[in-house]
Amino acid sequence: MSDVIKNFFKLESAGGILLVIAAAIAMIIANSSFAPMYDTFLHTYLGGMSVSHWINDGLMAVFFLLIGLEVKRELLEGALKSKETAIFPAIAAVGGMLAPALVYVAFNMGDPEALSGWAIPAATDIAFALGIMALLGNRVPVSLKVFLLALAIIDDLGVVVIIAFFYTSDLSVLALVIGFVMTGILFLLNSKHVSKIRWYLLVGFILWVSVLQSGVHATLAGVVLGFAIPLKGKKGERSPLKHMEHALHPYVAFGILPLFAFANAGISLDGVSLDSLTTTLPLGVALGLFLGKPLGIFSFSYVAVKSGIAKLPAGVNMKHIFAVSVLCGIGFTMSIFISSLAFGGANPEFDKLARLGILMGSTLAAVVGYILLHISLPKKAA
């Protein structure tokens, strides 16, 4: 294994540890006498948006840009290059969205108002899932990490579509049109072999603003920009995509992701009782994440492989896939976002119950997913 790849994994592992520490600190503060200060900080307005908004829709767009760059590189010259391998995470993601939603609906069939939260357990929190995986360092095969990246991003893109169609009542048509135009310009630049990153960043910023104003989750702009950055530069030039990926990684690992965890993991447990935890809404969310996710992802993956529709990534077996499918039950921030859309305005009590379910399901998925990965992975990197 080259020194570059070794350093990459060391960096990511350290960033993953910092991410978990930041989340733990947020939980402690949110349930202490410092909770009002924490809340005030997150709701302080800067330039027309709260600090929380800037982190979730601004800085996280940079994280999604990095994800887009990594997935594109793997699609063009890495583990997802072949059609059979590329289709595998897409099929798994479909199962990972359907099964959790069905579990939630089964628990809340008798409550029409609660049913509006059906999409809450359908999401996978890429940041936290990668953070847990990164704790295992270079024991994780590159192909397994890429599978998780691709699966999670397809999953979250699917959730963004769900949000746009089912949870957005005030879409701005003008902003969406501008966003589509900017997307077209980005891929026009790519087709014309423009290799200067500054032009992509300029158009990408306008795309981000338009998506933010459209009512659609602004992080989608980061994904689109990532896929537009060219892999190959002009003759004699370094790869624009690899250069940007290398430049962004330390800022994302040690800055954006820990800050993101700190801003979103602070859920107050004040007033929580055993009775409230065992009602159908939090149970539907928790079991949708902890049971529905692995059930959907693993079953769809198994059928896809056995039928010959897709093939396993190199160096990966079905035990690894099952462990990752459990890890994908970490819905956390995206699930919280959907909960706020489904219940936040109309029913704050339902929103709190859903968040409790998200906390339970995501914690179980993180702990069990880590244990399963620890058991199934080789003790040392090959």
From Swiss-Prot:
It is found in: Cell inner membrane. InterPro entries: Na/H_antiporter_dom_sf, NhaA. Belongs to the NhaA Na(+)/H(+) (TC 2.A.33) antiporter family. It comes from the Bacteria. PANTHER family: NA(+)_H(+) ANTIPORTER NHAA (PTHR30341:SF0), SODIUM ION/PROTON ANTIPORTER NHAA-RELATED (PTHR30341). Signal peptide: none annotated. GO terms for cellular component: plasma membrane. Na(+)/H(+) antiporter that extrudes sodium in exchange for external protons. The chain crosses the membrane at residues 14-34, 49-69, 87-107, 117-137, 146-166, 171-191, 205-225, 247-267, 285-305, 321-341, 356-376. GO terms for molecular function: sodium:proton antiporter activity. Pfam families: Na_H_antiport_1. GO terms for biological process: regulation of pH. It comes from Aliivibrio salmonicida (strain LFI1238) (Vibrio salmonicida (strain LFI1238)). HAMAP family: NhaA. Keywords: Antiport, Cell inner membrane, Cell membrane, Ion transport, Membrane, Sodium, Sodium transport, Transmembrane, Transmembrane helix, Transport. The lineage of its organism: Bacteria, Pseudomonadati, Pseudomonadota, Gammaproteobacteria, Vibrionales. It catalyses: Na(+)(in) + 2 H(+)(out) = Na(+)(out) + 2 H(+)(in). It is a multi-pass membrane protein. The keyword Magnesium does not apply. This is Na(+)/H(+) antiporter NhaA.
